Curated annotation (Swiss-Prot):
GO terms for molecular function: structural constituent of ribosome. This is Large ribosomal subunit protein bL28. Belongs to the bacterial ribosomal protein bL28 family. It comes from the Bacteria. It comes from Beutenbergia cavernae (strain ATCC BAA-8 / DSM 12333 / CCUG 43141 / JCM 11478 / NBRC 16432 / NCIMB 13614 / HKI 0122).
Amino acid sequence: MAATCDVCAKHPSFGYSVSHSHVRTKRRWNPNIQKVRTVVNGTPKRLNVCTSCLKAGKVTRAL
């Protein structure tokens, strides 16, 4: 699944958009997922990582 972080397993959350007249329509909030080349067990690999994991330094970037 492309909208899931491979590090922390963050995934989309679901809810409603509520208009002024209180009409509810279903919608989803996606996490900010980026494709990043990282080092996993000494080999570079491409992972889907959320930006909160990138800012926290939970992955090591491959150059």
